[in-house]
Amino acid sequence: MAKFDAHLKCSFCGKSQDQVRKLIAGPGVYICDECIDLCTEILDEELVDSQGNPRHSSESNRKSATASHKSGKPAPTLATIPKPQEIKNFLDKQVVGQEAAKKVLSVAVYNHYKRLAWQGDGQGETDLSATRLHKSNILLIGPTGCGKTLLAQTLAELLDVPFAVADATTLTEAGYVGEDVENILLRLLQKADMDVEHAQRGIIYVDEIDKIARKSENPSITRDVSGEGVQQALLKMLEGTVANVPPQGGRKHPYQDCIQIDTSQILFICGGAFIGLEDVVQRRLGRNAIGFMPSDGRGRSRANRDLKASQVLHHLEADDLVRYGLIPEFIGRIPVSAVLEPLDSQALESILTEPRDALVKQFSTLLSMDNVQLEFESDAVEAIAQEAHRRKTGARALRGIIEELMLDLMYDLPSKKNVKKFTVTRTMVDEHTGGKVLPLPANDERSHKESA
């Protein structure tokens, strides 16, 4: 046996057992004490960075990542937070109409960031008897193209905080194909240049939130991984928790380094069209009618039937959202709601010309780069707004109409050196929206129009 032991060698350096102090055996391999010392030195060198500071393990990395991403921007204070009236005035410059929704948003956002400033002063943490302030997330209900995303984006611009938009339709419950809910936080972190402290004061807008409603009012015995399952996964994030976010996105795994983000200071604004919600409200209003009122056979009284959809939604209650498919726990974490009105043709006209980034101003700026002055007649603006209203896609239809209308013009004008001014008339809009090809006027015709 001793003879056999004399032939044992280190699998790394090849020294025999007699040449080293200790030889440690493994499953079919051996390593000596000298090789162990060498490996320790190599690891020590790897764990020291270029500045001579020791590096940390993966668990410490998660903590140090949070600590190292200190925000270069100061935290909000009570003196720097804009007042509700100031917030609404800023929204008025960018968003046309929606007065009630602006008022609700202004107060909710002011209270949220006032709460952050109060916690930042330490008043809410040192005094155990002090009242603890909880955040109130916001639910925006309105048809497509009415300004839900623009309102949230404008708020983030005013407050100078990171802003991220997430699509609820791509989210699935953990363990299924699709995006985890933590990927929403990753988008916000990327907008903040991976600055955790700055990201924790940001705003996340979750669009198409109505698409994750469960398919029936009664709880299903089968798994709804993209509906009720997503609502369950979002509960803690909306309420406030420390979430582990993978820096590279995708699914999490146990051995992955994660960045920890506290969501208790992040304002979540959820928006959706909620098509058919007005019918749910009208059915409830019809059932609550007192006396023998004429009915249309669908549980709605004649008086309630004559209400517009937007007017009906002003009578919205939490029970209506439950019947629509949102679970009560989810609704309870979004206590503030605002209903946005559908845009009429008059509002669409204002959107074309009044806001800072109005479409007429955008296209005028584009053509001014080619030394061409672009003008829209008031009748032309009215015709564009009427066509957009007919298409039933809100303000999004305006850009599509103008892009189609200006295609030939923007194709030819850069090559025309003698054209200095162009006026869009109602006749041109009517010809285009009627399906006819809009020819670009000849040089003589343009010159004649300009001189007239």
From Swiss-Prot:
Xref: CDD domains: RecA-like_ClpX
Disulfide bonds: none
Region (Disordered): 50-79
A GO molecular-function annotation: protein dimerization activity
Ranges where the ClpX-type ZB domain occurs: 1-51
GO cellular component, one term: HslUV protease complex
Residue positions binding Zn(2+): C10, C13, C32, C35
Keyword set, alphabetical order: ATP-binding, Chaperone, Metal-binding, Nucleotide-binding, Zinc
SMART domains: AAA, ClpB_D2-small, zf-C4_ClpX
Residue numbers binding ATP: P143, T144, G145, C146, G147, K148, T149, L150
Any GO BP annotation: cell division
Name of a matching Pfam family: ClpB_D2-small
Keyword Chaperone: yes
Function of the protein: ATP-dependent specificity component of the Clp protease. It directs the protease to specific substrates. Can perform chaperone functions in the absence of ClpP.
Subunit structure: Component of the ClpX-ClpP complex. Forms a hexameric ring that, in the presence of ATP, binds to fourteen ClpP subunits assembled into a disk-like structure with a central cavity, resembling the structure of eukaryotic proteasomes.
Protein family: Belongs to the ClpX chaperone family.
Identification of the protein by name: ATP-dependent Clp protease ATP-binding subunit ClpX
